[in-house]
Amino acid sequence: MLRSNLKQIVDEKGLRYGFVAKKVGIANSTMTNLLQGGSPTLLVAIRIAKVLDMHVEEIWIEEDLDTM
C-alpha cells in the first residue's frame, strides 16, 4: 500500500495544484484524485517528482516494507 505525501509537499512548496497539473500534463481532475490519495501511473509519478524536484519515493511511501 502506498501512502501519499503529495498534498503536504505541494502545500509546503507553496505551489498551486493547477500549476503542478499543467506542468505534469494531467487534468485538474486527475490531480485532485492524486491529492486525495489516488495512485498515479509510473510516468505521472516521475513527472510529478521532477516538477517538485524530488524523488518518487519521497512523495509516495510504501507502508508495508516491514512485511517484505
Residue ranges and their predicted role:
Residues 26-40:
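Recognition helix of helix-turn-helix/homeodomain-like DNA-binding domains
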Residues 8-9, 13, 22, 33, ...:
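Short, charged recognition helix plus adjacent turn
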Residues 19, 30, 58:
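Residues in the helix-turn-helix
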Residues 4, 14-15, 40-43:
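Residue-level signal for the short linker/turn that defines the boundary of a DNA-recognition helix
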Residues 37-50:
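Short, basic-rich loop-to-helix N-cap that marks the start of a DNA-contacting helix
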